[in-house]
Amino acid sequence: RYNFLGVRDDETARFVQSIGASISSVHTCDPTVFLDVNALPVNSMALEEKLRARGFDFTKPAIGVMSGNQMCRMVRRMYGKRYQIIGLQSPSVYADVNLDDLSPYEWSYVFRYFSLTFTTFFHGTLLSLRNGVPVIAIALESEYSHNHMTKVQDFLLRVGMEDCYFKTDYSRRYDAEIKAKADQLISMNARERILRQMDCEAVNVEKFINCIRRLIVNKEDKENQND
């Protein structure tokens, strides 16, 4: 029997209740939400030298892509050579630079060099936003994403960015809608607003801490009563 059930999204909360959980679940934000990326042990000068050695041009705007070949091809189709395309996941022939040898800390830090990130992944979404960089989140093509709200979609809804989430089969018919939003995000210079929204979501960690604190206090009280 569990004394605490922490969940990261509403779909999981509904599932937990559907299988007869005897206690209510508590929304527990992913630790990435309150990660201080500026405090990571990253030598920024050394990282920038590494990026230059891979072909990254710091005089040209860049778009990070954390997914496979299809997404890189879509972004290339939208922007041509206007932006550098930086691959962060699987190497792609459509990327100008593929970064597949970064340390976990460097990888968490590198998003700040982009004007925008395209990704299908939850932690890619969070790390980009934690760096103050806007995101276009693309749903993974799966039976789950067709029938349920994904973790990425749930999170973007919580922080008021649900209009940055798209479903696509990567055909050209979706390009105009996605690009219109991407262009808007790039032009907004919304770094400070993004960081404020992330900090607001991070406040939810207090719920988790308070619940755990109460459990510990209750356990200690029971142990003292039994002594």
Could you describe each region identified by the protein language model?
Residues 1-227:
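Active-site anion-handling motifs in enzyme catalytic cores
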